[in-house]
């Protein structure tokens, strides 16, 4: 009988210990002790650069549509600043170095196109003068205009009238040259405007990368001072 009581006591003790272990293994929702410790948020705060870039783009797209070249250059500069704010730090540096390498070439091409445009414009003026003179000479010969010199009337000589066919050919050639020069000048103007826009975009992008934001708590664009060389 005593051994039976001892065995029953041992069974009750083991059952009680097992229930205690199961109770401790449970996590109570209302128990503040079982809650994990609270930590300060260590994740990096989202950058405000995309918001600034969006505001710059909104500024570039508002108001006028860029009818003049100055307004188009302004919008290109705004777009470049927005692009600089939106790009990653490494991508900014890569674009900056590429822009520094390509800008001298663009400026050289721009100077060459301006010289070519000046030559074509001068040729256009000369052709216009030749076309005007030949037109006046041909018209005077056809109308047999007489000039009065010292009280005596002088008519255009016959040999000059015989030059009318040649003058007509010269007039036609000068007119055709004027048309070709005008078309070439328009094409050069478009190329020059495009290169000017590219130069403005690349210079604005580099300025945005180099810029130290005194109005933004003196924090540079990339978070550290960039060398200017």
From Swiss-Prot:
GO biological process, one term: symbiont-mediated suppression of host innate immune response
Keywords in alphabetical order: Host cell membrane, Host Golgi apparatus, Host membrane, Host-virus interaction, Inhibition of host innate immune response by virus, Membrane, Transmembrane, Transmembrane helix, Viral immunoevasion
Keyword Transmembrane helix in record: yes
Segments passing through the bilayer: 119-139, 162-182
Main location: host cell
Stated role: Plays a role in the inhibition of host innate immune response. Interacts with host OPTN and thus inhibits the recruitment of TBK1 to the host Golgi apparatus. In turn, downstream partner IRF3 cannot be activated and IFN-beta production is impaired. Facilitates viral particle release either by increasing plasma membrane permeability through a viroporin-like activity or by viral budding.
Family: Belongs to the orbivirus NS3 family.
Subunit structure: Forms homooligomers via coiled-coil motif. Interacts with host OPTN; this interaction inhibits innate immune response.
Name this protein carries in UniProt: Non-structural protein P8
Organism encoding this protein: Bluetongue virus 13 (isolate USA)
């Amino acid at each position: 009988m005593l051994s039976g009581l001892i065995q029953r006591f041992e069974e009750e003790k083991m059952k009680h210990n097992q229930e205690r272990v199961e109770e401790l293994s449970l996590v109570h929702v209302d128990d503040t002790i079982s809650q994990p410790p609270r930590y300060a948020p260590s994740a990096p705060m989202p950058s405000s650069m995309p918001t600034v870039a969006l505001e710059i783009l909104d500024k570039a797209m508002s108001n006028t549509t860029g009818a003049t070249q100055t307004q188009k250059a302004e919008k290109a500069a705004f777009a470049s600043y927005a692009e600089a704010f939106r790009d990653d730090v490494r991508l900014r540096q890569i674009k900056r170095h590429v822009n520094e390498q390509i800008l001298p070439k663009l400026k050289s091409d721009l100077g060459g196109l301006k010289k070519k445009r000046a030559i074509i414009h001068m040729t256009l003026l000369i052709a216009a003068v030749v076309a005007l003179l030949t037109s006046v000479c041909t018209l005077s010969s056809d109308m047999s205009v007489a000039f009065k010199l010292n009280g005596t009337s002088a008519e255009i000589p016959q040999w000059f009238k015989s030059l009318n066919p040649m003058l007509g050919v010269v007039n036609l050639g000068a007119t055709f040259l004027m048309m070709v020069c005008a078309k070439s000048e328009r094409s050069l103007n478009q190329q020059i405007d495009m290169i000017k826009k590219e130069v403005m975009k690349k210079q604005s992008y580099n300025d945005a990368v180099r810029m130290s934001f005194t109005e933004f708590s003196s924090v540079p664009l990339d978070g550290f001072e960039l060398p200017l060389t």
